[in-house]
Design a protein with these regions (language model features):
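Conserved beta-strand-loop-alpha-helix junction that forms the acyl-donor binding cleft
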Residues: 104-110, 251-261, 278-282
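Acyl-donor-binding surface of acyltransferase catalytic domains
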Residues: 63-65, 70-147, 278
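Conserved donor-binding loop and adjoining core beta-sheet/short helix segment
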Residues: 3-12, 23-29, 36-102, 201-214
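A conserved beta-strand-loop-helix scaffold within acyl/acetyltransferase catalytic domains
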Residues: 40, 70-72, 173, 177-220
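Conserved acetyl-CoA-binding loop of GNAT-fold acetyltransferases
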Residues: 119-125, 265-274
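Recognition helices and adjacent regulatory flanks at domain boundaries
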Residues: 193-196, 206-209, 228-241, 248, ...
Length: 282
């Protein structure tokens, strides 16, 4: 008998999605970081996104070897898949008459998905962001002195943390989307702040560790406070704190932003891969 075809299992429950992808998260924690942390957030706070969906790609033996996620209004996220597998899901969703704002993830797979999607569903695909993936293999070191000191955010900091996280997302995506708060991350001690002269001047947070890997994100210094190295200080200190807890660190950066890329590489992060975000339009 010929082998069974590659199949896609739709999952709409976050806890079930966690179970489906547990093996992949353990074996490919960096690639699955976004999917794993977002899925965790939906287990903790089910209303965080409306209508989330996951697809587990299974090979002929039934093993889950590919992972996809869609949390509207975000583009569909390809966590792990070959270009051929990505094209396969695009064909399935196009045939079902699905509607997607875009796709993001591994460069080759996202490009393959977009090509298949537009050929079947119509419209155009435009690259909106190119992203580098970085990991940390040494203890971070700031190559210059930064005024001030690091501390872990507490509950009283939550309003400021949420305000700055909104500003961080607005700077990347443009205004218009209200982002979920970081109250749980604050409660879990995963938000770092930098204070200087009695004033909080910068922040970053670490995702829950999945497969032993945490993702540093939300790095934000208000524009009027930049130029003092605060972002370097908070990222280095937060990364070191997570390393001390036995977690490996990674992060993503916009490749069009040479400043942030230079900052992270100076701290010891190294570029290990690329992702891409593509927007669909009619």
């Amino acid at each position: 008998m010929p082998p069974a075809p590659f199949t896609f299992e739709l999952v709409t429950d976050a806890a079930q999605a966690q179970a489906r992808f547990a093996g992949l998260v353990a074996s490919e924690p960096e690639a699955l970081s976004v999917l794993a942390s977002v899925t965790w957030s939906l287990v903790v706070e089910p209303g965080r996104y409306v209508g989330p969906r996951w697809w587990a790609g299974r090979d002929a033996s039934g093993e889950v070897v590919a992972a996809f996620m869609h949390t509207p209004p975000h583009p569909l996220h390809i966590a792990l898949a070959t270009p051929e597998q990505a094209r396969g899901l695009a064909a399935v969703l196009a045939e079902l008459g699905d509607r997607l704002p875009g796709v993001g993830g591994l460069r080759a797979s996202a490009e393959a998905f977009a090509q298949e999607w537009t050929s079947l569903a119509g419209g155009t695909a435009t690259v909106s962001m190119e992203v580098g993936r970085f990991d940390l293999t040494t203890r971070p070191r700031v190559p210059f002195e930064v005024p001030g000191a690091f501390r872990v955010a507490t509950g009283v900091d939550t309003p400021l943390v949420d305000e700055w996280n909104q500003q961080f997302v607005d700077a990347i995506e443009g205004p218009g989307r209200t982002v979920p708060g970081l109250e749980q991350q604050v409660a879990d001690g995963r938000v770092g702040l930098w204070d200087d002269d009695g004033r909080t001047v910068s922040m970053a947070y670490a995702s829950p560790a999945n497969g032993g890997v945490t993702r540093i994100s939300g790095v934000w210094t208000p524009p009027e406070l930049r130029g003092h190295g605060y972002a370097s200080g908070v990222v280095a200190a937060l990364s070191a704190a997570r390393l001390d807890q036995g977690e490996a660190c990674m992060l993503y950066t916009d490749l069009a932003n040479p400043t942030s890329n230079a900052i992270y590489q100076a701290l010891g992060y190294r570029r290990v891969g690329d992702s891409i975000s593509i927007t669909f339009s009619a």
